[in-house]
Amino acid sequence: MKQFFKIISFFYLIVLSIALLIPLDLFIITQTVQEEISDNTAFIIHLVLFFILYLLFYFSFSNKFRILLFCIIYSVVVEILQIFTSRGFQIFDIIFNLIGVLISFLFLLYFYKNKRKQREFK
């Protein structure tokens, strides 16, 4: 099962990297749709994308600290690389990426803690 998650994780990472690094002009989105996507919506999208990234890597690899570290570094590196595209660097993107990772981390921590408690009561 871990092998399956590794494949999905790397595929997701590639697609995410492409989506975050290609210029927005290359997306088939009209100017009207781009204007409708507010900064708040974009931040929520970043949060969800990195929530999923951490979740997938969590089930793919055993060293949880390295996964957390990778997601943090990846978030910063991708944002820095956006300086060289027409997208630009935004500190709030990094913040919401990291919030997504943190929420995913806390969600899994809570889930497994409750699962352990349920086993103890049986």
Which sequence ranges carry the predicted segments?
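Bulky hydrophobic segments
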Residues: 1-94, 98-122
